[in-house]
UniProtKB/Swiss-Prot annotation:
Similarity comment: family membership: Belongs to the pyruvate, phosphate/water dikinase regulatory protein family. PDRP subfamily.
GO molecular function list: ADP binding; ATP binding; phosphotransferase activity, phosphate group as acceptor; protein serine/threonine kinase activity
Entries under HAMAP family matching the protein: PDRP (MF_00921)
EC number: 2.7.11.32, 2.7.4.27
NCBIfam families in the record: PRK05339.1 (NF003742)
Keywords: Kinase, Nucleotide-binding, Serine/threonine-protein kinase, Transferase
Catalytic activity: N(tele)-phospho-L-histidyl/L-threonyl-[pyruvate, phosphate dikinase] + ADP = N(tele)-phospho-L-histidyl/O-phospho-L-threonyl-[pyruvate, phosphate dikinase] + AMP + H(+); N(tele)-phospho-L-histidyl/O-phospho-L-threonyl-[pyruvate, phosphate dikinase] + phosphate + H(+) = N(tele)-phospho-L-histidyl/L-threonyl-[pyruvate, phosphate dikinase] + diphosphate
Pfam families to which the protein is assigned, alphabetical: Kinase-PPPase (PF03618)
Top-tier EC class: transferase
Name of protein: Putative pyruvate, phosphate dikinase regulatory protein 2
InterPro entries in alphabetical order: Kinase-pyrophosphorylase (IPR005177), PPDK_reg (IPR026565)
Binding residues for ADP: G151, V152, S153, R154, T155, S156, K157, T158
Amino acid sequence: MEKSVIIYVISDAIGETAQHIIRAVTAQFSLNKPADIRRHAFIRDEKALLETLEEAKAADGIVVQTLVQSPLAEYATDFCAQNNIPNIDLLHTLTAAVEAKTGLKSKQDPGNMRRLDSNYFDRIAAIEFAVKYDDCKDPRGLIDADIVLVGVSRTSKTPLSSFLANQNWKVANVPLVPEIPIPDELFQIPNERIIGLTTTPEKLAQIRKVRLKSIGLDESSSYSSEKRILEELEYGYDTFKKLGCQVIHVEDKAIEETAALITEIITSYH
C-alpha cells in the first residue's frame, strides 16, 4: 500500500517559494493521493518552530524549510537530524554560495522580499489595469498596455492577463467574435505587443462544453458546436494575419508555460 506523503513547509515568511517547488517535484510522481502540503508561515521564534517540528515528527512528515534567519534554520536542521526527519533547506546552501562569491553577508530579513517598494505598487497598478481592461471593456486601454492578448472565447485570455499582471506587466485582452468589429485601437499599437491565442477545435469544444455545464446551460449549444468553433478559429487566424502578430497554441499548456512564452516573445523585441 502506498504511503501518504506529508510535507511540512516551514517558513519565517509566507512559504510560497517552497510550495511552488514541492508542487513541481510531486507532479513528477503518479501518487494515488496528492501530497499533503502543510504550510506553517511566519515562524519567527524557537517555540513556534519546535511545535511545528514536533508535529512533523508525529506525522512522519518531510520538512521543507525556507527560514531566512540562520539560528532558526540551524535549529530546524539539527532537530530533523536528531529525529531522522527528512529535511530540505531551500535557502541556506545558495545563501552561503552568494556570500562566498560576493563577500557580502545576508540581511537575514524574512520580510525583505515583501517590502512595499515601487515594484510592489507597480504590481498593484498592473493588476488593476488587467481588471479594468479585461475583455476589451475600454478599447482605449490597448494603447497603454505592455501586452495585448487576442483570441476567441475560452483561450485563457483572462487568467493569462491576471498571471502576467502579477509579474508587473500591464495586460489588456480582446475577445474575437466574428459578429463584433475589431477595435480600431488594435491597429494603432505595434504588432510586437500583440499576442494571438488559439487552440485546436477539439480542445475548444471540450472546454466550452465544460463551461456551459458549469453554468447550467445546454452543452449542445451553438457556442460549443463544431461549425461555430471552426468559424471562430478561422476568423481568429484571419485577424492574427491582419495584425501581423505572433500566435501561441494554448492547448495542453499550463498558464505558467504560456505566460513564459509570452514574456519571452515580448522581451525579445526589447
